[in-house]
Amino acid sequence: KWVREKPILILQTTGGPFIPQMNPQTGQPIDNPYAWTRDMPIEIAQSVVDKYSKDYHIIQITRQGGYGLQGVERMDTQMSNIELFSLIAVSKKRILIDSALQHTAAAFGLKSTVFWIGTSPKVFGYKLHNNIVAKLPKKANQLINSYTFDFQFDNNINECPYMSINDMF
C-alpha cells in the first residue's frame, strides 16, 4: 500500500482530538483548522515541503479539516493502527508533532524530528528523537483553562502567548 517512486517522508501537521473553540455569543464552533497548542505552524510545514519535495514523497498526516499544504499527498481520513504503524515503518524520514506517531516511531527505534509547542519532551518525549521545543513566552500569561498541562489542547486562543511564528521557534 505504501510503495511510492521516492522514499517517504511523513509530515504530521496536526493530531489528536480537536475540540473546536466555541463562540461565546452564538454558542457555535469557530471554524479554525489550527490548534496552536499542538499543530505545526503552517509556515514551517510548507517550508519543510519546499525543502524536501525533490528527494522525498511527502505524506501529510492531518485530521479532517486540518490545513492543507502544496505538493504533498494528504491523509486526513481515519486509518487503522496497522495502517499508521506500517506507514511509520516504511518511511525514510518523519517530521512529527507530539502525538501517537512519535511514540510509534520511538517504539520502532526510528529517530524522528518532533515539534513541541504546548507539551514537553521531558514528560512525553524520547531522547532518540530530535526534539524541537517552542520558546517560552516572553510575557506572563494567564492560563485560566490549563490545569493538566502547561496549555490545554482544545485551542484556547485566549491562552496563546505567541504573537508570531518568530516568537515560537
What are these regions (language model features)?
Residues 18, 34, 85, 108, ...:
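Phenylalanine-focused residue identity feature
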Residues 17-27, 67-70, 140-143:
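Short acidic/His/Gly/Ser-rich catalytic and metal-binding motifs that mark active-site loops
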